[in-house]
Amino acid sequence: MKCAHFIDGPHCVKACPAGVLGENDTLVWKYADANAVCQLCHPNCTRGCKGPGLEGCPNGSKTPSIAAGVVGGLLCLVVVGLGIGLYLRRRHIVRKRTLRRLLQERELVEPLTPSGEAPNQAHLRILKETEFKKVKVLGFGAFGTVYKGLWIPEGEKVTIPVAIKELREATSPKANKEILDEAYVMASVDNPHVCRLLGICLTSTVQLITQLMPYGCLLDYIREHKDNIGSQYLLNWCVQIAKGMNYLEERHMVHRDLAARNVLVKTPQHVKITDFGLAKQLGADEKEYHAEGGKVPIKWMALESILHRIYTHQSDVWSYGVTVWELMTFGSKPYDGIPASEISSVLEKGERLPQPPICTIDVYMIMVKCWMSDADSRPKFRELIAEFSKMARDPPRYLVIQGDERMHLPSPTDSKFYRTLMEEEDMEDIVDADEYLVPHQGFFNSPSTSRTPLLSSLSATSNNSATNCIDRNGGHPVREDGFLPAPEYVNQLMPKKPSTAMVQNQIYNYISLTAISKLPIDSRYQNSHSTAVDNPEYLE
């Protein structure tokens, strides 16, 4: 008879014995072979088997070991995390206690707010009153008196012609602040076409010492020599004024009073922007200046400046256009016959200064662009430099002046101003301020060479010269070795033969010290400060 399931000895069973108690109280484990016969497992197989020998014994379970490892790892991570948290918390507490202690030690701790603006490393020279002497009164106005004088630096054997601007006695604190603000701006600039301060003397009445400019202001210079000024000179001056204004823009300075009267002539080939009485320094993030009040030159101002007292570099561009118009008309008055109080309404209606007779449409269109109502539509100073530099390479194409090719201006060494100064003082050691501040090679080893440009070609006698332009500033320019127009934008103009003509000084009046009170005030300068009297060109 055949068993239905498995055979265990003489018995038929449904399953082989697994852990059945046998002899000697031992557990019996059997497995079924290929013939379905139950066979004994190896004695070492204590949990059953699947085949003969030790190979048939089942492996032990690894689950408990794995579980123990996972639990142990998690516990380690928790311990490490708690340790890091405690360390960071302790560090935060220590820093907080340190900061609290520092705040208690100091009365005030200002937070850092970097502006990103470069530091102003300009040098301001403080002069002693014994270092300079006043020679003659050049003029005076509401702000005080301007003298012609000499600066003799302490411990040095040089004499430098200077202009000394002295505030009047009993000046208000506001006027003192204004002149010191002007000194700050002038001391901060360093460009061949911008006047710079030489020094300041802090006596009871503040005195500004600037370079003496022998030819005076450009406005009177072009009026006096209009029959000898050719297209080359006019375009060169336009380039140089634009370069000076572009430098101010790069230094975040708004001039606010650019006009031909505020440009000084060092030589016929070299002009400098001056008069920083209204200039303002903008911050790194500032784009415009809002004025609160004071006298302003209405006829040179942009429309937004007149209406809203907003001043930007683009409002200076408007003033530049008016200045160019003054040059091209040889010193005509802008909007002559129109009261300053009506200028804003005239401009709002679209009226502008007319085209000068000598100007081609190319030049006049540049002026028109400067007078656009939309400030952003006006050209930048760097663009004006490029435009006028191109024109200066071919002057007769852009300015039509009868007899242009025969015109020339006197040599700088024929200056009547310096000649008068030398007749009164011992000028053996005189040097120009440019050479003193930026001396050329061999300056200290060869005194005679260094002074030749100032002393040569002085043969004629001098007479007092009348003027209607009072100096407000001088300058500290970078030396230019007698300065001749740069070849990239100038076709050199030189006289065919030396001229003995003497240039009348257009910016200074020679007045005796006893006659100061009788000097008529210059209408263009009298209202530059808040203490000034009324003037139609400068209105509140």
From Swiss-Prot:
Keywords: ATP-binding, Kinase, Nucleotide-binding, Oncogene, Phosphoprotein, Transferase, Tyrosine-protein kinase. CDD domains: PTKc_EGFR, TM_ErbB1. Its EC number is 2.7.10.1. Pfam families: GF_recep_IV, PK_Tyr_Ser-Thr, TM_ErbB1. GO terms for biological process: negative regulation of apoptotic process; positive regulation of epithelial cell proliferation. ATP binds at L138, G139, F140, G141, A142, F143, G144, T145, V146, K165. Residues 132-399 form the Protein kinase domain. GO terms for cellular component: plasma membrane; receptor complex. Gene3D superfamilies: 6.10.250.2930, Hormone Receptor, Insulin-like Growth Factor Receptor 1, Chain A, domain 2, Phosphorylase Kinase, domain 1, Transferase(Phosphotransferase) domain 1. GO terms for molecular function: ATP binding; epidermal growth factor binding; epidermal growth factor receptor activity. It catalyses: L-tyrosyl-[protein] + ATP = O-phospho-L-tyrosyl-[protein] + ADP + H(+). The active site is at D257. Belongs to the protein kinase superfamily. Tyr protein kinase family. EGF receptor subfamily. This is Tyrosine-protein kinase transforming protein erbB. It comes from Avian erythroblastosis virus (strain ts167).
